[in-house]
Amino acid sequence: MKQIRITRSYGVVTFETVSIDTSENVFFTNMDTEQPHWPELSTNQLGPAPSPNSSQCTVPQPKSPLLPPFPYVCRYRCKISGHENEVGVINVFNPLAAGTTTLPSARVGTPIASPVQVVTGGMSPYQISDQVFQVTDNNGKIQRGSGSIGPGLKLQPSSDSTGITVTGTPTVVGTYNFTFIVNDAKGANLQQVQYSMAVA
């Protein structure tokens, strides 16, 4: 749940801009000691929201028969007469989640034909850490390492908040197993996901 602070500075009222994913709610805290405020999501776009200082407020999706594109922007304003110039913005993203965990088989020395989406959603930029891999060949010989997801492979984070893909050219025949940690720009964390790919 994300807090949205309502503040006043030199006579200007500001509704804090926040970024959330679709699994999160928001709540408003009025820190303006001079006046009350009542944020309301734009009725022509997203419908009304509860009044400030409630325990939680659901941010609805656009009224459309189709799923909204992500990320999308929810705009709202104060519904108190005379306060219509007080507006706020909520950036809404898909949750950070694991994508494909069993990757399509690949051939040694051949570039992966299409990048494989291993992480979806979240807010870019992404921070990737703790990459660990193990490759087991057809004779049972094991190669372990860290700092990458395996010989010839790499993680490619997107800049448009769509997630992370695997690209590259595998250089070892065998089964690649790897894991890594991802943190996104709004503080979401994804870890302890096991991925695998067979290379012939």
Across the structure, where does each feature detected by a protein language model lie?
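Extracellular/luminal low-complexity segments enriched in Ser/Thr/Pro
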Residues: Q61, L66, T165-V173
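Extracytoplasmic copper-binding redox domains, predominantly the cupredoxin/blue-copper superfamily
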Residues: M1-P111, V118-Q127, Q134, P151-Q156, ...
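Aromatic sugar-binding surface patches on proteins
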Residues: N53-S55, D160-T165
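Disulfide-braced loops of extracellular cysteine-rich modules
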Residues: G147-I149
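Short, low-complexity Ser/Thr-rich regulatory SLiMs
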Residues: P157-S159, P170
